[in-house]
Amino acid sequence: QRQMCIRDRVNPAFFGKKAEKIREDSRSMKILVIDGQGGGVGSQCIAQLKEERETDWEIWAVGSNSMATSAMLKAGADAAATGESAVVYNAQRADVILGPMGIAFAHSMMGEISPAMAAAVSGSEAKKLLIPMMRCHVQVMGVSPAPLSAYIAEAVAQLHKMNDRL
């Protein structure tokens, strides 16, 4: 059985031939994009990932709130869900977790990231590509401030390198 998601209600035909191909292709990289607040960072990541048409990446979106989830669905996520349970469930099934740095810290993003969400992200065996955000009150030494688009482009380049290794 698969988990119900917003896309099921929005477009019931979604889980047709495309989804069957994704499930059959064991080499398909499962990318979990997690975001909160308005979903702006996550939706920009998904839009950039969707431009990479030659890839067979399966892009899942999980928002800490429905507004973030909706924004990521509009950006083109293949499947989406909302809330703590969705983060915990999907973090264990993803190959890569992509999102703002705050998703790995409890009570970040104005309290939207619960301790269980942060533990699921940090405890997952998935490769984590975290985008530094200066609003998180965490500064990573050696990381120079850059525009969000530069960090997203770097994440996409890293995903291509990882995909080549599969």
Regions found by a protein language model. Give the residues of each.
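Short, small-residue-biased leader/transition segments that mark boundaries at the very start
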Residues: 1-6
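Polybasic, lysine-rich low-complexity intrinsically disordered segments
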Residues: 18-22
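Glycine-rich phosphate/diphosphate-binding loop of Rossmann-like nucleotide-binding domains
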Residues: 30-63
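Short, ordered loop/turn segments at secondary-structure junctions
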Residues: 36-39, 64-66, 85, 103, ...
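A short helix->loop->beta-strand "cap" motif at the edges of active sites that frequently abuts
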Residues: 56, 123-128
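N-terminal beta-loop-helix "entrance" segment that forms/cooperates
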Residues: 57-82, 139-142
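Glycine-rich phosphate-binding loop
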Residues: 79-117
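Short, glycine-/small-residue-rich phosphate/pyrophosphate-handling segment
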Residues: 130-166
